Structures are given as structure tokens and as C-alpha cells.
């Protein structure tokens, strides 16, 4: 954004707590009273977040008071408000991040980076690239987060990539294999669960499911490799009745109807990525990949999809 004659990065809210609550009220009026909401990019600098050793809920969204009001409203209706907290990667310095010990290392001893790439030219995009946290730091970071979260009154968190990412650390001083990291992740999830948090996990590596209250971004289709003759709803058969689960966001797929039918086939919940403000805010930003996310555009379709899902599958779905 231009500030005078100087281009500057400015943090703006894609959704506010007040407007999210208004949308939730509209859903309830339309007969949808069983849903959960995940707040993505709502702490520590937004989508390009800092390490969660401290906790600052974005003022542009409504701050800590706005968060509490929304969380209480949803809880009164029997629904959950998950706060997205990522313990495995970080985009920015700050919040006490020690880059010498808390960032994992490649075998080359360079800091471990999860690179993002520009869809326009295929080149590495520094703005969407994240550094991977050293798994040996998970316990310390989680301890600091719990102290900060207690003051805000947070009960539900989405541990994001902890359910799908598994990286080693090849710093010769403290080398970790991916198997070592798996055991650390299990210990971290057990720590959070035993501390009273309801956990939403992405992807759902098998060793994480024991600790999940719900799982999202579950793969409901095959990889599409030509050697595979058929796609069967294997994941749905395994998870059904054990944990609440949903696939990837329907409104981010090339074929909405096909993805919707796959959700029904697998007995999965419906998952949408939405924002309450004008989607043009995302143009020419690192979040421009979130296309077609306007609440106003999708509300009618969401109500229709919920009714269809209820008609076909409600009696046997969890």
C-alpha cells in the first residue's frame, strides 16, 4: 500500500470478529447450527506470523476482547472457535526467536527453509517462504504459548502443520532424524491435550489422530497417478466414527461439485475458506491464492450444501 509516496506493507483484516459473529448468526437463522470456525492468521502478525512464544491477537480483527466475545458466542451455541497456532514454522523474526538455536538446519548446515514459489514465474518467493522450527524447541515454545494463552482464555487451537509436516534437524550439535521428530511431535500433542486444549489437526498423519478432536484437509481422493485404477473412500472408512474430519476447502478446488460429492462419499464434513471483507484486499499480496472466498458469494451455496449433506448422510455421519 502507498503511504504518501512510499510503498509499505500494511496489515489489514480480511475478517473481523464482529462480522464473523454476524455471519454465524445468519447461518443459525438458516438452520445451520452445527459448525466450527478456525481463525487463520489472527495472531502475531497475521498470515506471515511470528513464533508463538508470545501471543498478540490482531487489533485489526477486534483484539483479545473481540476474540473472547466471539468464542463465548460460539460456545453458547455448542460450536468451537479454533485459533490457528503453528509451532513448526515461522515467517518473521521477533517474539524472542533465537535463530541460532530455534531454527532447524539442512544437512548443508544452512537454515531450513520451506520455500514458496511464485505461480507466475516458478521462482522462489521469499514472502511466502518460512523457516522450520527446530523440534527440540517445541516444548519450550509450547510452554511459553500456554502461559500467554491462559490470560486470553483460549481452549481450542488448530495446531496446523504439526499434523502433516515432519522434518529433521541436521545441525551437527543436535542432530534429529524424522523418526526422532515424530516422537517429539507426539509428546507435544500429548502435552497440549493434557493441558485441556481441544486440537484441530491438518492432514492427520496417523500418529497424530489420537490427540485430535477434529481433522481437516484430509485427502479424500487418490493421487491421480495413472497406475491407480480406482479411487475408493478408504480414509472415510477408517476415520468414520473415530474423529470428526473434513477434506480440503471446497471453494478452493477446480471442481466444486466433484469435491462436494467426495465429501458425501467419505462421510466428511464440509470445509470452506471464507473472509468477511472485500476479497480485493488480497490482490497483489502473498495471500492472492485465496480466490473465491467472499462470505456474501458463498453463503447461499453453503446453506444449500449443508441441506443436501443432511438429506443424504446426516443420520449416519459423525
Q: Residue locations for each model-derived region?
A:
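Aromatic-lined carbohydrate-binding/catalytic grooves of carbohydrate-active enzymes
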Residues: 2-140, 164-168, 173-174
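Structural preference for beta-strand elements that scaffold enzyme active sites
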Residues: 34-36, 78-82, 155-158, 196-200
Amino acid at each position: 500500500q502507498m503511504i504518501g509516496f512510499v510503498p509499505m506493507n500494511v496489515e489489514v483484516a480480511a475478517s473481523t470478529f464482529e462480522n464473523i459473529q454476524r455471519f454465524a448468526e445468519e447461518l443459525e437463522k438458516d438452520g445451520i447450527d452445527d459448525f466450527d470456525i478456525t481463525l487463520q492468521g489472527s495472531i502475531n502478525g497475521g498470515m506471515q506470523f511470528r513464533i508463538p512464544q508470545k501471543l498478540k491477537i490482531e487489533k485489526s480483527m477486534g483484539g483479545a476482547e473481540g476474540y473472547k466475545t466471539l468464542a463465548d458466542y460460539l460456545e453458547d451455541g455448542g460450536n468451537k472457535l479454533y485459533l490457528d497456532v503453528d509451532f513448526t514454522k515461522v515467517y518473521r523474526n521477533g517474539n524472542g526467536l533465537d535463530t541460532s538455536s530455534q531454527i532447524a538446519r539442512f544437512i548443508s548446515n544452512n537454515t531450513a527453509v520451506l520455500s514458496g514459489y511464485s505461480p507466475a514465474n516458478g521462482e522462489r518467493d521469499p514472502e511466502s517462504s518460512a523457516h522450520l522450527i527446530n523440534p527440540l524447541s517445541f516444548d519450550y515454545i509450547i510452554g511459553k504459548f500456554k502461559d500467554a494463552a491462559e490470560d486470553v482464555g483460549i481452549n481450542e487451537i488448530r495446531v496446523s502443520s504439526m499434523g502433516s509436516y515432519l522434518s529433521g534437524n541436521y545441525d551437527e550439535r543436535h542432530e534429529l532424524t524424522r523418526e526422532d521428530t515424530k516422537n517429539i511431535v507426539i509428546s507435544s500433542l500429548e502435552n497440549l491435550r493434557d493441558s485441556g486444549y481441544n486440537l484441530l489437526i491438518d492432514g492427520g498423519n496417523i500418529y497424530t489422530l489420537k490427540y485430535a478432536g477434529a481433522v481437516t484437509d484430509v485427502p479424500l481422493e487418490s493421487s491421480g497417478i495413472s497406475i491407480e485404477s480406482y479411487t475408493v473412500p478408504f480414509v472415510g472408512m477408517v476415520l468414520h466414527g473415530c474423529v470428526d474430519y473434513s477434506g480440503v476447502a471446497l471453494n478452493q478446488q477446480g471442481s466444486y461439485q466433484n469435491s462436494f460429492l467426495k465429501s458425501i462419499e467419505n462421510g466428511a464434513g464440509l470445509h470452506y475458506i471464507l473472509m468477511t471483507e472485500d476479497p480485493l484486499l488480497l490482490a497483489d499480496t502473498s495471500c492472492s491464492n485465496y480466490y473465491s472466498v467472499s462470505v456474501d458469494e458463498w453463503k447461499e451455496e453453503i446453506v444449500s450444501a449443508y441441506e443436501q449433506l443432511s438429506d443424504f448422510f446426516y443420520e449416519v455421519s459423525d
